[in-house]
A protein has these predicted regions:
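General small-molecule cofactor/ligand-binding pocket signal
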Residues: 57, 190-192, 310-312
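Class I S-adenosyl-L-methionine
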Residues: 293-341
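Conserved Class I SAM-dependent methyltransferase catalytic core
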Residues: 252-307
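Conserved SAM/SAH-binding loop
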Residues: 193-198
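S-adenosyl-L-methionine
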Residues: 1-41, 46-50
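Class I S-adenosyl-L-methionine-dependent methyltransferase module
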Residues: 55-57, 61-183, 216, 220-256, ...
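Conserved proline-anchored active-site loop of SAM-dependent methyltransferases
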Residues: 23, 37-51, 58-63, 203-222, ...
Length: 341
């Protein structure tokens, strides 16, 4: 019996799942004739999922999040019975004799050796199924996304991969599940794996939703292992945390000097009637790395280049995976720009 999972079954830094009702309320009460939605920094895709009845444009520069977007939002038809059979085979396969890239580099870190052997086997095999035409692009993405969710459920971490818990007490078995993505989707949905600034003007939409990184903590650092498995180039890894070279994956939005410049460039390029910008002040942190890189004044100034701006605020403490976990002053802000210039 194959279990299922949905898009919300994942801990992820900055995930807005618990704010979806509030975000939709702001849109419904202040925007008109919304038929298309651009999730510019999609992450897990939770916000895009709230607007999946619209024509979607979804973008993220991380390959792991791109696969998730394909899984949840690509209009390509999938064979769920075939996916179920593949998942059953992976869940019952004994990979204990399979030495591979994962077991050689990550055994007894985030996972025990047997789990690493299985992850490596599955990742190799699903690429083989794609290259031989046994699965299509979206089916391939569904299996990889299922693998990521399975890894997250049992990883020996605090919810991200910046480090692992070094007590040797590994629990749980890697179990892939079938994604709950059997719902109608617009045939014109577009999914991108790119720097959002580079593709911002490719699609004309009614509303563009921006939820960029807030501070200097790079997502490619926190989720380097999932990105490694997604790219599957099998690079050398370094240090205790076993990280690959991530030089080309760094986001300008995590850097104080570049964040405002990057946002202004993006805002000027967007082709939309509304810009909805989500930003968390992260409270007042003792660690400067956790402080927001953009001020409210900078955000309003930049958005005002395109139109009139309204600001909505709610108290919210998102998933932080141990980062400044005792902070209670977090506020989520929504800046809504009605584009008229």
């Amino acid at each position: 019996m194959v279990k299922t999972f949905n898009i919300s079954n994942r801990r992820y830094l900055g995930n807005k799942y618990k704010l979806l009702d509030w975000i939709k309320q702001i849109v419904n009460e202040n925007c008109v004739d919304i038929n298309s939605f651009f999730d510019v920094f999609s992450g897990t895709g939770s916000v895009a999922s709230a607007f999946k009845d619209k024509r979607l444009v979804v973008s993220d520069m991380m390959r792991s999040n791109y696969y998730a977007a394909l899984c949840w939002f690509s209009p390509e038809v999938i064979d769920r019975d075939k996916l179920k059979l593949i998942i059953e085979q992976y869940n019952t396969f004994d990979a204990s004799n399979e030495d591979n890239y994962m077991s050689r580099n990550f055994s007894n870190t985030y996972f025990d050796r047997i789990t690493c052997q299985k992850i490596g086997y599955i990742r190799d095999d699903i690429d083989h199924l794609l290259s031989t035409g046994q699965v299509n692009t979206r089916e391939h993405a569904c299996i990889i996304t299922s693998l990521f969710y399975a890894m997250d459920r049992i990883s020996h971490t605090c919810g991200h991969y910046d480090s692992f818990i070094r007590d040797g007490k590994y629990e749980g078995t890697l179990e892939l599940r079938l994604p709950e993505n059997d719902y109608p989707l617009n045939a014109e949905n577009h999914i991108y794996c790119a720097n959002s600034n580079d593709i911002a003007n490719l699609d004309e939409v009614d509303i563009a939703y921006l939820d960029p990184p807030y501070n200097s903590r790079q997502y490619c650092d926190a989720y380097h292992l999932l990105e490694n498995v997604a790219l599957w180039n099998k690079p050398e890894v370094y240090g205790v945390a076993k990280k690959m070279d991530r030089t080309q994956m760094k986001s300008k939005y995590c850097k104080s000097i570049q964040a405002a410049e990057a946002l202004e460039d993006l805002v000027r390029k967007l082709r939309c009637r509304y810009i909805l910008f989500s930003y968390n002040n992260n409270g007042k942190k003792l660690q400067c790395r956790s402080n927001a890189k953009l001020t409210d004044e900078e955000i309003v100034r930049i958005l005002s280049i395109r139109g009139d701006v309204q600001v909505f605020t709610t108290d919210y403490k998102g998933f932080e995976a141990g980062y400044d976990a005792k902070n209670k002053d977090n506020q989520e802000r929504l800046f809504l720009c009605s584009v008229n210039r």
